[in-house]
Amino acid sequence: MDEKPVQLLTDARDGFTSNSTGVRYEDNEYVRNGTCSIFLFTEPLAGWREAVAKRQRTRTDWAERIKWLLDERYPDVEQVVLVCDNLNTHNIASLYEAFEPAEALRLAKRLEIHHTPKHGSWLDIAEIELSALGNQCLAKRRINSVEKLNEELSSWHTERNDGQKSVNWQFKTADARTKLKHLYPILNF
């Protein structure tokens, strides 16, 4: 699971198409319509992901998405293992802030959270999905509302899920020693 802030932008002026060349011209100027946050969940080996935009990124927003994950996506699963970064909202306390204690406890018992190490967000596979989302859905586009963004996100994750784009992210110790020399020194005794 990961989050991504997004600026909501609209064109300051409408673009136009040249009658003589057929080329479309767009002005670089834009108007900010605020920001929002994309919450992305993924199950890498199953080739599933879902992204939803919320107007803000609060403990309650995170807790509501966790409730959706546990009750809607995995209603029959006893324990869900969630890998996420160390953001201040990504913890069990958020459930207690958002829900009544009995409901928060019910959700907390089904959730096992593993935080990636500091400066280790690359271990969070949702980062890979957010990168794909940025390149395939958000790049070089101006989306002016959370509603429009959610339409685009729904189309993106539906198409990506239908294509069964799974992530099999792994590496061997030898590869880690090559790429992360400062973390995996070779000791000579």
Model-derived segments and spans:
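Short beta-strand segments
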Residues: 1, 81-84, 114-115, 170-171
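C-terminal domain-tail junction helix/linker
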Residues: 12, 148-189
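RNase H-like polynucleotidyl transferase catalytic core
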Residues: 25-30, 104-125, 141-143
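Short, basic/hydrophobic alpha-helical segments
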Residues: 60-81
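Acidic/histidine-rich, metal-coordinating catalytic segments
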Residues: 77-91
